[in-house]
Design a protein with these regions (language model features):
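Conserved donor-binding loop and adjoining core beta-sheet/short helix segment
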Residues: 59-98
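Active-site rim helix/loop that mediates acceptor-substrate recognition in acyltransferases
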Residues: 42-63
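Acyl-donor binding region in acyl/amide transferases
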Residues: 84-137
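Generic recognition of long tandem-repeat/solenoid scaffolds
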Residues: 10, 65, 87-89, 146-149
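Short amphipathic alpha-helix that is part of the acyltransferase structural core
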Residues: 2-48
Length: 153
């Protein structure tokens, strides 16, 4: 992950059972791999492989959070010009879609982002219904990325 900060030194904390906890991706890899494969199948233009997610977490560049419904993988992105940190929710997967888990855990991740010195939360998605869900709850569209694939490239 470009411009990400190594975050393995995140302080341990006790959390209520209803909140996500930092998981051991090695121990949970079979479940996580299935979730990442489902994300990639639904979004074939994503460029990473399941093993890349595993490697980022093991290397300390991302954190794997497990929750009863599924999992989230986050990282910290640092702006190269301002040095501001953004708490980036890279992947989120649940066994049952449509449960609005992003809202259920929003306050938790806002708290964690604040604790690590981030100035914002960020998600990137190709799921159209997420726009309404997020913008109705205080999120805004920071940018729209258009891509043109070169035939020779």
């Amino acid at each position: 992950m470009a411009d990400s900060e190594k975050i393995i030194d995140l302080p341990e904390r006790s959390t209520p059972e209803v909140e996500p906890v930092i998981g051991d991706i090695r121990q949970d890899w079979d479940r996580v791999r299935l979730g990442v494969e489902a994300i990639l199948q639904a979004n074939p233009k994503l460029s990473f492989r399941p093993e890349d997610v595993y490697a980022e977490v093991v290397a300390g560049h991302a954190i794997y959070w497990k929750a009863p419904e599924g999992f989230v993988v986050t990282s910290i992105e640092v702006d190269g010009f301002t040095s501001e940190k953004t708490f980036y929710i890279w992947l989120a997967w649940s066994e049952r879609r449509g449960q609005k888990n992003v809202l259920k855990y929003q306050d938790f991740f806002k708290r964690i982002a604040h604790e690590v010195g981030a100035v914002a939360l960020e998600v990137r998605t190709t799921v159209p219904c997420m726009k309404a869900l997020l913008t109705e709850t205080g999120w805004y569209i920071g940018e729209v990325v258009y891509r043109y694939r070169l035939k020779d490239g």
